[in-house]
Amino acid sequence: MHRIAILYHSAHGHTEHIARCIGDGIQQVAGLQTDLLQALDLLARPEDLLAYDGLILGSPTYLGGVSAPLKALMDATGGLWRQQRLRGKLAAGFTVSALPAGDKQSTLLSMFTFCMQHGMLWVGNPILPEQHQGVPYDEAANRLGSWSGLMAQADKASPGHAFAPGDIKTAHLFGQHFAHTLLRLHAGASLEHA
């Protein structure tokens, strides 16, 4: 069974809620195990990431970048980087901010650069914005129009689960896409070694 880690930091519950929704999407695809891992819990043992075939990073966007706890975990992987021990793993990213734009793109680019330096393979978000097909904006998948990763918006001081239905739909579809991509990658690798 292939394993996916969703590693994240969530200060107010919003990023954790999206992480769980991504995990729900992954679980709709057979043959995968998903673990939700908090960044702070991995600081002392980043080598735990070696047990996974795919890594999905999540963070709120704070002042145009990842949160300090996720950045601390990224920095703690220096020993893994020196030996390129994460090379070839599938990777993706997601972020949440209080505004529709909120400079989330720079957060995803930080995650992307981190994964590229480790030699991982990045999975974007291929979901077309559904509002262009007549779906009401708040119900539309990928309503924020992000292709480099998953973006979601939660109003300031809202409960952790308070997202537009479209953002929840996007998280489920993003998880499914990542899961199918991982299975295709491993099926191709199995054929090469047959």
For each predicted feature, which ranges?
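Short hydrophobic segments within beta-strands
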Residues: L7-H9, L37, F94
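N-terminal beta1-alpha1 ligand-phosphate binding loop
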Residues: H2-V29
